[in-house]
């Protein structure tokens, strides 16, 4: 059997750490990538097509899109949905970065053997605990794994192990190097968080220079200076970093409007009466998205969960939904094309008269409102084809 490796990613944005991960993998690589909305409840800095192009330029062979109802989920559900898509495409291996050196295949075997017992353990825990707390207690109890509170990729890797249990998928953990959630650009591999912050700082500076230039003389707008980040981004995609971008600031007025006017927030996915009341009260005084999160979260409702809930509200995700049967292709190389040829009937390459996933397509329409320079995200868009050199 040919080795085909799956990777679950956001690439928000793609950086040298991601390039390093891809370079550690032999053979064809399929990336199941979040679309325009991220797992932690935020819009992607660059749209899905831009990020797919980055991935293909740096070694991915096939990039497929996670529907929004998979991409914006807690770790277990995010992992489960993504692994199912990759397994459907025929992967033999799943590669991911982790801060830990444990054997995740062994963890998957333990979960496969004790799944019923482990899930019962979670259900028996006190209701006031958050789901991440319950999950960590489960892993500690059944495997002895310890958590130090600063291993987000390890937590996600455990979710991958759980999702891959019993599916005959070999788990390949690649040791992560660098501070992957640092907010500062440092030597070595910079985090996606640091790159996002730096990019918005550079964009604000460019906009200010453009404004000042227009006030003095009629000249061309200032160009985005990417020199500050060039050491942290693969050179082949550096220019792509000048693409249109967005963040929650662009959508906050829309979110305020939705929360204030919708009298039935409880109809939204995972929103209950208690949260509805908290949101209605908090939105009256919150001046921005981060303030709203701070006002709503509690020990039980973590910040990550609140950010996802706010995303569901903005995107109008209902309580009940079905996942799409077909897999949407964003781009491929020659090797990726060979994988697609083996999966005819499972894929959709162009969204037109035939829809793919209504909720994702509507979510993309809202995403487009975040920057006037964003292009149409679905209708008529064809997969990116990586030309071989």
UniProtKB/Swiss-Prot annotation:
NCBIfam families: PRK13670.1. Coiled coil: none annotated. ATP binds at residues 8-21, 97, 153, 176. Pfam families: HIGH_NTase1. It comes from Lactococcus lactis subsp. cremoris (strain SK11). Catalyzes the formation of N(4)-acetylcytidine (ac(4)C) at the wobble position of elongator tRNA(Met), using acetate and ATP as substrates. First activates an acetate ion to form acetyladenylate (Ac-AMP) and then transfers the acetyl group to tRNA to form ac(4)C34. It catalyses: cytidine(34) in elongator tRNA(Met) + acetate + ATP = N(4)-acetylcytidine(34) in elongator tRNA(Met) + AMP + diphosphate. One of its GO terms (molecular function) is ligase activity, forming carbon-nitrogen bonds. The lineage of its organism: Bacteria, Bacillati, Bacillota, Bacilli, Lactobacillales. This is tRNA(Met) cytidine acetate ligase.
């Amino acid at each position: 059997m040919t080795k085909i490796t799956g990777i679950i990613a956001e690439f928000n944005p793609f950086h040298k750490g991601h390039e390093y991960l891809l370079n550690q993998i032999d053979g064809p690589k399929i990336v199941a990538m979040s679309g325009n909305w991220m797992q932690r409840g935020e819009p992607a800095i660059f749209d899905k097509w831009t990020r797919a192009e980055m991935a293909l330029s740096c070694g991915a062979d096939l990039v497929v899109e996670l529907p929004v109802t998979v991409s914006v989920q807690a770790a277990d559900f995010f992992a489960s949905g993504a692994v199912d898509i990759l397994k459907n495409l025929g992967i033999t291996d799943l590669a991911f970065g982790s801060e830990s050196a444990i054997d995740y295949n062994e963890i998957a075997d333990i979960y496969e053997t004790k799944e019923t017992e482990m899930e019962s353990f979670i259900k028996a825990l006190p209701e006031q605990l958050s789901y991440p707390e319950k999950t960590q207690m489960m892993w500690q109890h059944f495997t002895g794994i310890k958590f130090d509170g600063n291993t987000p990729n390890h937590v996600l890797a455990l979710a991958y192990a759980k999702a891959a249990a019993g599916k005959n998928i070999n788990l390949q953990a690649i040791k992560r190097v660098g501070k992957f959630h640092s907010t500062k650009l440092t030597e070595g591999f910079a985090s996606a968080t640091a790159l996002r912050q730096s990019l918005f700082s550079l964009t604000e500076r460019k906009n200010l220079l453009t404004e000042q230039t227009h006030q003095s003389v009629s000249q061309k707008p200032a160009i985005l200076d990417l020199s500050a980040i060039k050491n942290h981004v693969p050179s082949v995609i550096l220019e792509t970093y000048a693409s249109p971008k967005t963040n929650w600031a662009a959508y906050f007025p829309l979110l305020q409007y939705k929360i204030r006017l919708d009298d039935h927030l409880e109809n939204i996915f995972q929103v209950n009466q208690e949260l509805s009341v908290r949101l209605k009260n908090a939105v009256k005084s919150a001046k921005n998205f981060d303030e709203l999160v701070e006002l709503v979260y509690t020990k039980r409702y973590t910040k990550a969960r609140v950010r996802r809930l706010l995303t569901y509200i903005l995107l109008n995700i209902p309580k009940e939904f079905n996942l799409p049967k077909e897999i949407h292709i964003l781009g491929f190389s020659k090797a990726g094309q060979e994988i697609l040829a083996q999966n005819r009937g499972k894929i959709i390459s162009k969204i037109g008269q035939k829809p793919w996933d209504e909720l994702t397509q509507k979510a993309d329409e809202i995403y487009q409102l975040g920057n006037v320079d964003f292009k149409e995200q679905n209708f008529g868009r064809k997969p990116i084809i990586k030309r071989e050199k």
